[in-house]
From Swiss-Prot:
Belongs to the MCTP family. One of its GO terms (cellular component) is endoplasmic reticulum membrane. Its cofactor is Ca(2+). This is Multiple C2 and transmembrane domain-containing protein 1. It is a multi-pass membrane protein. InterPro entries: C2_dom, C2_domain_sf. Gene3D superfamilies: C2 domain. The chain crosses the membrane at residues 758-778, 861-881. Ca(2+) 2 binds at D270, D323, D325, D331.
């Protein structure tokens, strides 16, 4: 007699909807518990109705019972329990619990199943009252498909074996389990939708038998495309086992090291038959890496490395390739998926991915070559994703906190060193413009950090002399990409060349002068590169406080003592910031709450706290430590509201100069608006400590300030333009008023004042020496100092500037409201008035410089000859006559001019002379044009006659 397991490969009919409905109804209502004796009814599955529960198991050992049992259970076995469904990542696994160990069992052995399986079995498969069959024997079926004690029935067996029926449930599970070579194979799937499939439920109700058959060769893994559906009987085949470790199914932290090697035979998207490809890596709709752009190449070589931290392997790595188009939307060049569950742990794997376009699956788009290593992470990873982010997205509370800060009470250093780069010059760069020159600038990139140099116009040998720093996150340093570009206004910048610097090959604590040859171009770049040890930049919990540890505090004080002046001159001091809590923050969500987190910035160092959800009074209790490079820097603490679908909302900001900090004092700072011109809602409690070397700080003052890499772009604002104009006008008016005062002394408007000024002038000029100029400034500073310490502070609050700032803030508030009283036309007129005033001032300043230039250019020869004569006379006077006599004569002339000619018009001879020299605009206006003979009346008449 052929066993029923032989028909395992035959096609099985689909499950009828009515059967699924009945089974699901049984699961919901539990009608089987009250119908223990209803299972002995004769008839096959055709007689079962919706009110009939799943048949119970009869007592074995009789041929009649076995035959009836086979008849009743054939309703299950004639129908393949298939329910096609798409995996859902939003629902838990409802039909499968954790896998239980599978042991061979007999008729009298109790089942060691889970509580969920036992409850479902009691609910769906009730045992008949008075039955001698133990519950533990349910589903434990030998290979013949019968109970161990049952006698074979010729009639029942022949009828079952002659028809192409599916194997019994136990055989089918055992066959699939042995094919996979894993006891966990009886799990239907790890993810399911909201309703469990009938096959999964039936599989759950019967414990899997022991592997009685020899294991078969595992089937080849099948790749799953997006939108493809799976059924419960068609399980995913795992990768063939090897000696290497296989990723666990349980969630855990992994590190995925990816090396993007190259691309081959990529698609051409540009008109010239080439492309400018770059690659994006995404995991779960989040971009985790973007490569550099390889210009005009269909076989690009990147050789870039990326390190990605992932907390599960369910999401595949999504690779997308694009063609860069300046000013336009980048063209799609293909995509591919990498199933992370197929990777072996701690083993480098070379991967070749074929790019496909979902809309055009038949197109050949080339391949991408990668090298990947998947390693499990133990403990909390260092946070390398929290710096210099422009927006913050929320995935989940656990993920956000684990990505940002360590939950353990320990200190977490964020980077392991600093690479200081000085861009000196470029030599013999390639000419990209039609005039034989270029407008070069340089871009630097190290991981996610970027820097762009200033543009040097019209030169092939630019001198930049710029210095900046990058953070090192890896011990080996990494590779820094450098590209040179030519700036073109109004169109795409031209690529000049590229080069790379392998930082791992450079020794630390030493300055290296590098002359780098540009690849794919011409010329050299000259750099100075210095790798330093780890800076004092870290995040820790409040329980780990460097300043409260007496021994560590002594080490910090010793490091910045006055005796260690020349030890790392750039390391000026140490800053520790305790971000304790905030109170009364602004409600940014519709629920009346906020999800606040805090950003602490010191120049280009930018650190974040974790997010406290649904709270207007958050407590962070975090300690930040920074390395001070400039004691004149300003510490900025900004509070944001984390938003799920867009960039973070601003809640408040406070700016604190380092020199104004009182060490060890916990202080509540009132939050201000974005412009720091007025208060906003909420306060933040901080405790700050600053330790620095005064000599290093003084020397650093004479060096240019560090430029911030991330700055908000300035927008055109009427109030801002008006404010700057008024400030400039006030500065100029100081000089104008001083000139008016001196002129009033010359005019004898007040005879006593003019007489006193005349006598003072004679004494000062007669006894004047050049050293008296700095002495006068020193006396002025000393006088103001004694006024301040004596309580006679003559400094007044600048109410004019405050009023302007308040007006600017009010103007910003009014701009946000639709019902503004002032019309758009009035705004245009107000802006026009300010612009006209600025235009006139700029015109006068530019005209003055152009007139001086045109004087020496002999634009007007008469004036140039006159200037030569005047300069000769003044040269002779200065050579033969002392300076004090010249100034004395000039002063006497000015003081007596009004007395000699009361109605004379005051003037300045030098400015009067320059007013006669035309500016460049006037030169063009005064230029005589040559007549065009083609437009002469005579030629026009001659052409008409022809």
């Amino acid at each position: 007699m052929e066993p029923r397991g032989a028909a395992a490969g035959e096609p099985e009919p689909a499950v009828s909807p009515s059967f699924q409905a009945r089974l699901w109804k049984n699961l919901q209502l539990g009608v089987g518990k009250g119908k223990g004796g209803g299972g002995g009814r004769a008839g096959g599955p055709e007689r079962r109705t919706a009110a009939t529960p799943t048949p119970s198991l009869p007592p074995p050992k009789t041929t009649q019972d076995v035959g009836s049992t086979g008849s009743r259970w054939s309703g299950f076995k004639k129908r393949k329990q298939v329910l096609d469904r798409v995996f859902s990542s939003s629902q838990p696994n409802l039909c499968c619990s954790s896998p239980e160990p599978l042991e061979p069992g007999g008729a009298g052995r109790a089942e060691q199943g889970s509580t969920l399986r036992r409850r479902l079995r009691e609910h769906l498969l009730p045992v008949a009252k008075g039955s001698s069959t133990a519950a533990g024997t349910v589903g434990v079926t030998p290979p013949g498909g019968r109970s161990p004690d049952s006698a074979p029935s010729s009639s029942a067996s022949s009828s079952l074996s002659s028809s192409p029926q599916p194997p019994p449930r136990g055989d089918r599970i055992r066959d699939e389990g042995t094919r996979r070579g894993s006891p966990e194979a009886h799990l239907c799937h790890q993810k399911s939708s909201s309703l469990p499939g009938t096959a999964c439920l039936e599989q759950l109700l019967e414990p899997a038998p022991p592997p009685a058959e020899p294991a078969r060769r595992p089937a080849e893994p099948q790749s799953l495309q997006k939108g493809e559906e799976l059924d419960c009987s068609q399980k995913i085949n795992p990768v063939e086992t090897s000696n290497a470790d296989v990723p666990l199914a349980d969630p855990g932290m992994y590190q995925l090291d990816i090396t993007l090697r190259r691309g081959q035979s990529l698609a051409a998207r540009d008109r010239g038959g080439t492309s400018d490809p770059y690659v994006k890596f995404k995991i779960g709709r989040k971009e985790v890496f973007r490569s550099k752009i390889i210009h005009k190449n269909l076989n690009p070589v990147w050789e870039e490395k990326a390190c990605v931290l992932i907390d599960h392997l369910r999401e595949p790595l999504y690779i997308k390739v694009f063609d860069y188009d300046f000013g336009l939307q980048d063209d799609f060049m293909g995509s591919a998926f990498l199933d992370l569950t197929q990777l072996e742990l701690n083993r480098p794997t070379d991967v070749t991915l074929t790019l496909k376009d979902p809309h055009y699956p038949d197109h050949d788009l080339g391949i991408i070559l990668l090298s990947v290593i998947l390693t499990p992470k133990e403990g909390e990873p260092r946070d390398v994703t929290m710096l210099m982010r422009k927006s913050w997205k929320r995935s989940s509370k656990f993920q956000t906190q684990s990505l940002r800060l360590s939950d353990q009470h320990r200190k977490s250093h964020l980077w392991r060193g600093i690479v200081s780069i000085t861009l000196i010059e470029g030599r013999d760069l390639k000419a990209m413009d039609s005039n034989g020159l270029s407008d070069p600038y340089v871009k630097f990139r190290l991981g996610h950090q970027k820097y762009k140099s200033k543009i040097m116009p019209k030169t092939l040998n630019p001198q930049w002399r710029e210095q900046f720093d990058f953070h090192l996150y890896e011990e080996r340093g990494g590779v820094m990409d450098i590209t040179a570009w030519d700036k073109d206004a109004g169109k795409r910048d031209d690529f000049i060349g590229r080069c790379q610097v392998d930082l791992s090959s450079l020794s630390r604590e030493q300055t290296h002068k590098l002359e780098l040859q540009l690849e794919e171009g011409e010329g050299h770049l000259v750099l100075l590169v210095t790798l330093t040890a780890s800076a004092t930049v870290s995040i820790s919990d409040l329980s780990v406080n460097s300043m409260e540890d007496h021994k560590e505090r002594e080490e910090i004080l010793k490091r910045y003592s006055p005796l260690r002046i020349f030890n790392n001159i750039k390391d000026v001091g140490f800053l520790q910031v305790k971000v304790i809590r905030a109170e009364g923050l602004m409600a940014a969500d519709v629920t009346g709450k906020s999800d606040p987190f805090c950003v602490v910035e010191l120049n280009n160092d930018r650190l974040l706290t974790h997010t406290v959800y649904k709270n207007l009074n958050p407590e962070w209790n975090k300690v930040f430590t920074f390395n001070i490079k400039d004691i004149h820097s300003v510490l900025e603490v900004t509070v944001y509201d984390e938003d799920r679908d867009r960039s973070a909302d601003f809640l408040g900001r406070v700016a604190i100069p380092l020199l104004s900090i009182q060490n060890g004092e916990q202080k509540a700072y009132v939050l201000k608006n974005k412009q720091l011109t007025g208060p906003t809602k909420g306060v933040i409690h901080l405790e700050i400590d600053v330790i620095f070397n005064a000599v290093k700080a003084s020397l650093r003052t004479l060096i240019p300030k560090e430029r911030k890499y991330i700055e908000e772009e300035n927008r055109l604002s009427k109030q801002l333009l008006l404010r700057n104009f008024i400030r400039t006008k006030r500065c100029v008016m100081v000089l104008v008023n001083a000139a008016y005062y001196v002129n009033s002394c010359f005019d004898w408007d007040s005879p006593p004042r003019s007489l006193a000024a005349f006598v003072l002038f004679l004494l000062v000029v007669w006894n004047f020496e050049l050293y008296m100029i700095p002495l006068l400034l020193l006396l002025l500073l000393t006088w103001n100092y004694f006024l301040i310490i004596s309580g006679k502070d003559n400094r007044q609050r600048d109410t004019v500037v405050e009023d302007m700032l308040e007006d600017e803030e009010e103007e910003d508030d009014r701009d946000d409201k639709d019902g503004e009283k002032k019309g758009f036309i009035n705004k245009i007129y107000a802006i026009q008035e300010v612009c006209v005033s600025v235009q006139n001032i700029l015109d006068e300043a530019a005209s003055l410089g152009e007139r001086v230039k045109n004087t020496f250019n002999w634009t007007v020869p008469f004036l140039s000859w006159l200037a030569i004569i005047a300069l000769c006379v003044f040269t002779a006077i200065l050579y033969f006559i002392p300076l004090r006599y010249i100034v004395l004569v000039w002063g006497i002339n000015k003081f007596t001019k009004k007395l000699r000619s009361p109605y004379a018009i005051d003037n300045n001879e030098l400015l009067d002379f320059l007013s006669r020299v035309p500016s460049d605009v006037q030169v063009v206006q005064y230029q005589e044009l040559k007549p065009d003979h083609s437009h002469s009346p005579y030629k026009r008449k001659k052409n008409n006659l022809g």
